[in-house]
Amino acid sequence: MKFKKLLLILLLACPLVAEANPIITSWYTKQSGVYARVIQSSAITTPKTTWPDAGVTNNNTGGAAQTLPVYADVQRIRYTTTDVYINANGLASYTMGPWFTNSGGLFGFWPLSRDYQVRITRTPAPAATKTRHPGGMIGMMVNGVAIYDLGDAFSFHQTANSPSVTGTDGMGATGDGWWSRDALAVEVVTFDPGFAHQPGNNGQYHFHAEPKALRYQLGDNMKATYNASTNTNTYTEDITNLHHSPILGWAYDGYPIYGPYGYTAAMNAASGVSRMRTGFVLRNGQNGTQNLISTGRVTIPKWAAATFGISNPGNVNPVVLPSTQYGPTTTYRTTGPGGTTTYSLGRYCGDYDFLGDLGQTQGVGFDLDQYNGRTCVTPDFPLGTYAYFVSIDASGNTAFPHMLGKQYYGTPNAGNATTIPTNAIETFNGGPNTQETMLPLVTNPTTGNVAITWSSVEGDTYKVEASNNLQNWTTLNASVQGAANTTQTSITENGATIANPKRFYRATRTATATYDP
């Protein structure tokens, strides 16, 4: 790696100017030179840059672990006229973890660096025929963390339907399409305070719902309450100075994903800001829904039938299912190694109906369509765009379908990019490739001390020098480590202004620490 000297004076920078397009400029990069960190348990509360420690439960496939430090958030941004290309390791700069199970034990699945190189279209368009989300990644947060669908790949597998429905949930079971599980109903206990987790087979840290810690980092109407005993934050809504949510991520159809707050009137930026109300409600007998608590899971809502290809020749709502597709009653229970499971209302996607199919009007009784978005103006798109919004209820809790519905609004046109076009324009290259800059000096007029500060990369080594004439340089410190968990490093030269009528400083990166590329 070529190391560059940083001069406090005569520093002429000619940065590339990114095209004024939110899909290019909205990515979170200011902490790209910081290592990702994990808190491992309620007993091991010091954030670690490698994990898990020896002796800590590791249920990852093959015992896979993060054995080298890895840089957080988005690392590189490039674009062409048609696409944007994002490089990231898939790990956040806020402290991740810990993750627990229902019983309070360690989850045992650990996040791993993913080395993403993702392409997302810059020219999204509504799809005439909507596409159901696949398993795995369906978008990317602006910090480079994966977005998953609201489901968890499990559904109900019926073993009998007479005299009563019996069975259990399983991955890829035959209930897909009518009784597929809502991940939040089952997995939320395994989320960290940032509201994400990862599977053990690949360590892909991801979100199914609102990214609480990222929202806090971006200033999206959130506050953090620190718990000293666990060294973690609890994130809650803060509407004291309510403002329009920022872009939190991008779906793989190229449309933005905002936080939960938008303009009250979709096309009027002067209409005030409100929480965007989900269009989905539980099928509990209210709002014109069927009451599954009394009827059992013998019908499927119209939206789900259309989404999963279930025949509905009469275009009715709800759709009556054959007995072989009945789901469990809301009081049904099974007992297994993890204890007793109750199949309560809200466990499955089919437990929710869409208000638009119940005679209500979008923009009046609810704000978001069945894809969990709307066409609207936003601060980033003053002329209008289609946009998704994360959904929360009036108490600040996540609300179905949480982030995106079960289908893309637009045509999916994104994914892993094996190559980058040679004409792609680079607007950011951070992490270990950061081009450091000197920051203004801070002097103490009484002591003559000078604080020398520069932007730095965590783990790297710098030599700091001083000169009175820009020709002869004196080494002040030959080995300064880039400060931990921050993007700036400082040292002080004592009495500098008293001993020297004028003084110049420079810092040179002399070594890069070993890291996970």
Predicted feature locations:
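Short, composition-biased motifs enriched in small/polar/acidic residues
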Residues: 435-517
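Short linear interaction motifs
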Residues: 97-103, 180-194, 238-241, 361-375
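Solvent-exposed N-terminal domain segments of exported/luminal and surface proteins
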Residues: 21-192
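Extended, compositionally biased non-globular segments
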Residues: 253-255, 260, 269-435
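A short, polar beta-strand/turn micro-motif
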Residues: 85-135, 139, 209-264, 401-403, ...
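Hydrophobic h-region of N-terminal signal peptides that target proteins for export
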Residues: 10-19
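Histidine-centered catalytic micro-motifs
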Residues: 202-212, 386-392
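Sec-dependent signal peptide recognition
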Residues: 2-9
